[in-house]
């Protein structure tokens, strides 16, 4: 299953949007809260010695929050890449299209935060990410819960997030089919954030505990998938202990 590619005018609108200047919403606290939440999840999940590539790295804030020594960011926007170089000169950033960039190196961890909502071809994105993944590497991919589409649009009007062109909104079945076609399989996933705002006590209670409960987890803002190439699961050979009774 390949989702219908957006009309050419719509694709041009997205590419023009990505080429625009790096900017923050009028009230950036919700965006920062979401970024910090994802950073916390990645810090806990990505191995410390992993070579990390973030596709759609923007100004580099998420990549900088990771403790890994080897960190590379790719972004379509030249102004975002320039700003990332300025903010974090010790990290590596390069300009590139998520669907067609090429790197000689293979990475242990590839991060793609909400990219599937904006690229013109989700399958091509997944295939390119997989092509840059080390044999036993992992892709960390996030996407919004489709139930939040209307609240997120209201957030744009309220200045809580940047206004974007029309987005891809894919159901779980569509995503699973796309993962399979790209030769990927889900290792695990995690639903995160019932309340994407820093409200003392309440946010911690909802996001840390209530969001993990059955059924209620389906209302979370976004899902973090951990993917691997199909057929690369690490298998451990069985161990056998042989005990031979003997008489001294």
Predicted regions and their residues:
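Class I SAM-dependent methyltransferase SAM/SAH-binding core
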Residues: 58-99
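A conserved beta-strand element that flanks and buttresses the S-adenosyl-L-methionine
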Residues: 111
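A short glycine-rich, Lys/Arg-flanked "PGG" loop and its adjoining helix->strand segment in the class I
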Residues: 123-135
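Acceptor-substrate binding/catalytic loop of class I
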Residues: 157-174
């Amino acid at each position: 299953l390949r989702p219908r590619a957006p009309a050419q005018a719509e694709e041009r609108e997205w590419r023009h949007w990505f080429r625009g200047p790096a900017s923050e919403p009028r009230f950036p606290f919700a965006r920062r809260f979401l970024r910090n939440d994802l950073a916390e999840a990645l810090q806990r999940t990505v191995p410390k010695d992993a070579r990390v590539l973030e596709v759609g790295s923007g100004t580099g804030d998420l990549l900088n929050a990771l403790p890994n020594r080897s960190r590379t960011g790719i972004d379509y926007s030249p102004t975002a890449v320039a700003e990332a170089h300025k903010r974090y000169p010790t990290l590596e950033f390069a300009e590139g299209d998520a669907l067609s960039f090429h790197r000689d190196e293979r990475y242990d961890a590839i991060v793609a935060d909400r990219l599937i909502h904006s690229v013109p071809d989700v399958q091509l994105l997944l295939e390119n990410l997989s092509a840059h993944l080390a044999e036993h590497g992992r892709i960390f991919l996030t996407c919004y819960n489709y139930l939040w589409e209307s609240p997120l649009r209201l957030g744009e009007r309220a200045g809580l997030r940047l206004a974007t062109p029309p987005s891809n909104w894919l159901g779980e079945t569509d995503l699973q089919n796309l993962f399979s076609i790209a030769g990927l399989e889900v290792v695990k996933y995690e639903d995160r954030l019932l309340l994407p705002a820093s409200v003392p006590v309440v946010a911690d209670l909802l996001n840390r505990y209530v969001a993990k409960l059955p059924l209620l987890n389906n209302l979370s803002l976004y899902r973090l998938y951990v993917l691997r190439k199909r057929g690369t699961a690490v298998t451990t050979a069985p161990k056998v202990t042989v005990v031979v009774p003997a008489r001294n």
